[in-house]
C-alpha cells in the first residue's frame, strides 16, 4: 500500500463531492482539539482555589485528559476503520462538547476531572482526519493536505495559550470551557455537513479484550510517568505501575497476535517503515514538548533572577504564537519536499531543524526576540516532521488500517511528550537556584532541558535514517492500481 492514496478519480468519474471543504474543516477540527489541551494552563495555579481542593488533587484535571487521550486515540482509530471515520470523528467532537459543558458547569473537583476526561476522548480527531484525507483526496493533493492537518496540532497549541490567557484575565474562568464548547459545536456541524463518509470499511467485530488490555497498560505507564515525580520515582506505587505496564502490554501483545481481528495489527506495525517511524515519533514528540516546557517559564520568571524576562502569561503566549503560524505556513513546503525526495528525507530534515532551533536557544535566551526566533525555527522543524510521519505510516499500511495505524503513531508522539514532561520536571527540580525564600529552576536547568530537546531531535534523525526508502512515484502508482480493489472491499464490508 502507499501513502498516495487511493481515491484519485479515474477518467470519466466525477470527483467526490465537497472535497474542497474537507481540508479546512478537518484542520479547524484539529485546531479546536489542540486548543482544548491548552485551556487550563492559565488557571492551573488558581484551580485549588476555584475547586476547593489541594494542588495535587487538581493536577488530575490535566492527568485525566492525558490518560483519556491515550486510551481513546487508538480505539477511535480502529472504530473508524470498522464503522466509518467520519462517524467516529463526529463522536469525538461530541465528546469534546459534552466534556466542555461539564467542565463549564463545574465548581468542584470531580465534575472537572470528568469533564476533562471527556475532552481527552476527542484526541483521535487529527489521526481520524488524516485517514479521511487518504480516502477522499486525489494523490496529488494528499501530501499538502496531510501536512496542513498535522500542523493544526501545533497551531492550536501555539494560539491556545495567549487566547486562553486573554479569556482568563478578562472573564470568569468558566468562560474557557464555554468557548471550547462553542468552537466544538461549530466544528461538529461543519464536519456533519461538509465531510463525506468514506466507503473504506473493514467491518468485523471490535476487539474489546484487546482494547481493555491496551487501555490498562497505557494507563499504568502514563500514570507512572506523569505522577512519578509527585509519588517518588522509587516509590512502590510508581515502580508497581511500571511493572504492571510492562506485564500488561506484553500479555496484550501476545493476545493481539492470536486474534483474527485485533485492535492493532502488530504484524503490520512490525513492518520496518511503520516500526521505525513510530520509534522516531517518540523522540520527535520529546523534542517538540521540551520547547513548551521551558520557554514560557523563562519568559515569566522575574527579571531579578538574572535570566527571567518578567513577562506576563499573555505575553509569553504571544511569543509562542508565531511558531504555530510557521508550522502552518511551511505545510506546503513540507509536502513539496516529500513529493520530491520522499517523506523519510522530510522527516530527517525536520529533525535537524528542530535540533538547530534548540541549539540556537541554548545560546540565545536573554531577550524576548531570542525566544521568538528559536521557537519559530523549532516550529518549522516540527511542521516538517509532523507532515512526514503520517505519510510514512500511510505508505506502509492498507487503507483499511489507516485509522488505527495513524492513531498509534499519534499515541507514540504523546508518549514522547509525556516522557519529556517527566524528565524536564526532574531536571528542573534538581537544578535550582535560591530566590529569596523560594527555590526556582536555575538557568543551567533550563539549558539542560533545551539540550535534551536537541538531543532527542538528533536521536529522531538517527532513527529515521533507518526507515526503508520507497520512491514516491512507485508508491503513487501502486496506490492507484489498488484503489478499485480496496473500494470494492469497503463497499462489500459496508453491505
What does each of the following model-derived ranges do?
Residues 118-151:
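Cytoplasmic helix-loop-helix junction between adjacent transmembrane helices
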Residues 19-36, 40-42, 55, 59-64, ...:
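12-transmembrane solute porter fold
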Residues 50-52, 84, 105-110, 171-172, ...:
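Helix-breaking motifs and short loop linkers at transmembrane-helix boundaries and internal kinks
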